[in-house]
Amino acid sequence: MRPYVILNAAMTLDGKIATATGSSEISGEEDLRRVHELRRECDAIMVGINTVLADDPRLTVHRVDAAPGDNPVRVVVDSMARTPPHFRVLNDEAPTVIGVSESAPPERVAELRKRAEVVVAGTRRVDLHLLLERLHGMGIERLMLEGGSTLNYSMLTGGLVDEVRVCIAPMIVGGRDARTLVDGEGIDEMADAIRLELKRSYTLGEDLIVEYTVKG
Ligand SMILES: NC(=O)c1ccc[n+]([C@@H]2O[C@H](COP(=O)([O-])OP(=O)(O)OC[C@H]3O[C@@H](n4cnc5c(N)ncnc54)[C@H](O)[C@@H]3O)[C@@H](O)[C@H]2O)c1
Ligand SMILES: Nc1nc(=O)c(N)c(NC[C@H](O)[C@H](O)[C@H](O)COP(=O)(O)O)[nH]1
């Protein structure tokens, strides 16, 4: 058993979720409120370690009203336990789970255990199936996946995503080194693409929101 997973992201019209230099303010004000409402409805928010290192996110509900207990559990996928102990994802605003692999240096794991629950899953990379199973065992039934591109790819190709919600902002930045909604190794044949079904589309200010379910 695993949680129901909603992938949420904001991208430019050309599919970038950050520029090559890591600048990533894409969503408009209204979309950011939508994101935080979605955070409030979920039991956990999951991101990859590169997103933590790039943005130092809080991963809490802070743009809409929230009672202290409304903050979801924060989950970082971090094979080598590189989450810096002073980063905001480890503050006391919400509980945090760090998913590491068996290859993570024990001294860094011990340091993280002072501030978070550490789940060891996988030998070199985090085994996402196993991590999600463990999260479900902790009572997490609805999980919001907030990127980045590399984790999005692994989660989608692992068959671990149920819905995709994307904010398309009216911006274009280009750049072959800029992260896109989904990177990773990529699928070779279009016939093998992950198929989605469009459920809803609407505008929020200048942004276009598109919501899909992933076909099983
Ligand atoms: N616009 C948005 O909605 C949005 C959202 C999130 C992140 N971002 C941006 O995305 C960028 C980071 O994306 P990224 O692709 O570099 O990194 P990421 O956040 O997807 O982290 C990927 C890393 O996670 C670790 N990992 C461990 N096990 C893994 C597994 N099984 N599968 C995949 N990764 C695994 C690896 O170290 C891997 O390099 C940042 O610039 C950030 O600002 C944008
Ligand atoms: N929906 C969305 N629109 C954006 O324009 C953007 N840059 C992100 N990025 C998601 C990523 O996880 C960010 O790191 C957090 O949004 C940081 O913000 P918080 O401190 O957690 O509120 N997400």
UniProtKB/Swiss-Prot annotation:
Keywords linked to the UniProt accession: NADP, Oxidoreductase, Riboflavin biosynthesis
Matches recorded under Pfam families: RibD_C (PF01872)
Keyword presence, Oxidoreductase: yes
InterPro entries: DHFR-like_dom_sf, Rib_reduct_arc, RibD_C, RibDG_C, Riboflavin_Biosynth_HTPR
Disulfide bonds: none
Organism superkingdom: Archaea
Reactions catalysed, as given in the entry: 2,5-diamino-6-(1-D-ribitylamino)pyrimidin-4(3H)-one 5'-phosphate + NADP(+) = 2,5-diamino-6-(1-D-ribosylamino)pyrimidin-4(3H)-one 5'-phosphate + NADPH + H(+); 2,5-diamino-6-(1-D-ribitylamino)pyrimidin-4(3H)-one 5'-phosphate + NAD(+) = 2,5-diamino-6-(1-D-ribosylamino)pyrimidin-4(3H)-one 5'-phosphate + NADH + H(+)
Pathway: Cofactor biosynthesis; riboflavin biosynthesis
UniProt binding sites for NADP(+): T51, D55, S79, M80, A81, R82, V126, G148, S149, T150, L151
Record-listed E.C. numbers: 1.1.1.302
GO biological process: riboflavin biosynthetic process
Entry keyword Methyltransferase: no
Gene Ontology MF terms in the entry: 5-amino-6-(5-phosphoribosylamino)uracil reductase activity; NADP binding
Family: Belongs to the HTP reductase family.
Quaternary structure note: Homodimer.
Function: Catalyzes an early step in riboflavin biosynthesis, the NADPH-dependent reduction of the ribose side chain of 2,5-diamino-6-ribosylamino-4(3H)-pyrimidinone 5'-phosphate, yielding 2,5-diamino-6-ribitylamino-4(3H)-pyrimidinone 5'-phosphate.
Protein name as annotated: 2,5-diamino-6-ribosylamino-4(3H)-pyrimidinone 5'-phosphate reductase
